[in-house]
Amino acid sequence: MAGRMPREIAPGVFWIGDCLAQRHRGRIYHGYNAAFLVAGEAASALVETGHPKDFPVIERHLGELLARGVAPLKYLFVTHQETPHCGGLGRILARFPDAVLCGDVSDYHLAFPHYEDRMRWMKEGDAIDLGGRSLLAVEPVIRDLRTTWWGFETRDRVLFPGDGFAYSHYHEDGHCGLVAEEAVTLDLPDVSAVFADLALFWTKFADMDVYCDRLDQLIDRLGVKTIAPTHGLPITDVTLTVPKVKEGLKAAALLPESGTNEKLVLAAAAPA
């Protein structure tokens, strides 16, 4: 994937970061822990800071982009307090001493008390002005943690949904670094269902039709043109691709919860 990144997925919006490899169904199954740089006229914002292992890659990608002349990095927007999203936070704050962390900043002061003065709370509708474009905190329709916010870039209509469009891809099929519409052999409903089954367990106890309808309303209201998920390939054709992801979310909700299933199998196999 190294030759494809950083990749500009919308004007001034750059996809950076790396894959996390694991075995699944006998193949090398990759999940992204992506980050995105949104470059304005006066400042740039980094959305997510990546998995801890990815900091050297993210630092290199940021260096390449800054060397090209993008505006200085002044803001960090992390969707929520989970390692694949904020795992590079301390090192990014140290590397870029003028950067301010924005969003729901709950608990970060406990890990980084020396950076507490560089943390800025945001609520829905609050904006970060980058010059010529802004980054808004918007409703997190599908969230992992209570503290989740999604981000939305106003000029080119890019949505940053964190875990909201989470799905993996197959390394062996050359999907790394592609946008969703380029990965023609990727079964999006299937890989979306796998991710939701393993990571978003609450979807099994909710009416996902309601959540998917709410997602459609948000996309329509904001006029979203591009979707940049943390754990999936960027979506550049919203009308074509979003229905496939929703199909996977609804399918996963109908599957038995994996951990409970395994316990039942073990209990049934145990001697009386």
Model-predicted segments: where are they?
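C-terminal regulatory/interaction regions
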Residues: M1-G3, T236-A272
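Conserved beta-strand hairpin/beta-sheet module of binuclear metal-dependent hydrolase folds
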Residues: R4-E64, W150-E153, R157-P161
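Metallo-beta-lactamase
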Residues: R7-E8, F96-P229, P234-D237, ...
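Short catalytic-loop micro-motif centered on adjacent basic/acidic residues
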Residues: A45-E48, Y75-T79, A137
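Short, glycine/acidic-enriched loop or turn micro-motifs at the edges of active sites
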Residues: H51-P52, T83, A166, P234
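Active-site metal-binding motif and surrounding structural segment of the metallo-beta-lactamase
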Residues: D54-L101
